């Protein structure tokens, strides 16, 4: 009984932490989604009460639908582009650095890894200042006569979305490059040499051997990155703050993701009920995609067979 009691004591503190900081806030958020707890019903001046599923109806089919679905669409577009570009260009960079004839391979790896060593919020704030209307990049372009006016990198909706994706590539590609490099360096050399002897081109070797090996190992990571990009608060908020403003959206800008919109609904608008609904929908979207995607991976199928 004594060893068992010791186990309970050791597990009680972590379980208490999970209860207080994960389960209780989650249950509280779910409950708030079924109330009218917003800026018009803030205790103690005004009490809120249960309203059932009306908040969900408001977001999905009511006046908030005009904001929710465009933001959801941009969130998914952003997540796809952010994940695919980092994966593709990370592999390309790894292949270039691992070319046999390339000199100073360690130096090139170190240069690209420096972006990982720098805290991401510092990189994003530097990029924000660099791309600002009066920033160094616009000043340089105008000094060289390439443009007569500052380019709207962060102030035009389309330019801002493209800029965000490019900046995210700068931050994320080195990580994919490192993982891909480790996979490439551990590929069976006998298999590669046999393919070369059989007359396979470099592209055929990449298509039939290298890329499938990278994809099998990195598929769970890609799923995780996609979900992470759906909830990528830092890149959007630190770079554009969700802007530029969009008069057609409620408390949201043209580059806001669902997660940054949720933040604004909570902190700025104090519409806690709507924010809770958005939080539940984000969780549902992420959970369903993760489950469907992971059950189709080779890792899951091999584990299921065993």
Language-model features: where?
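A structural signal for multi-pass alpha-helical bundles of membrane permease subunits
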Residues: 5, 10-306
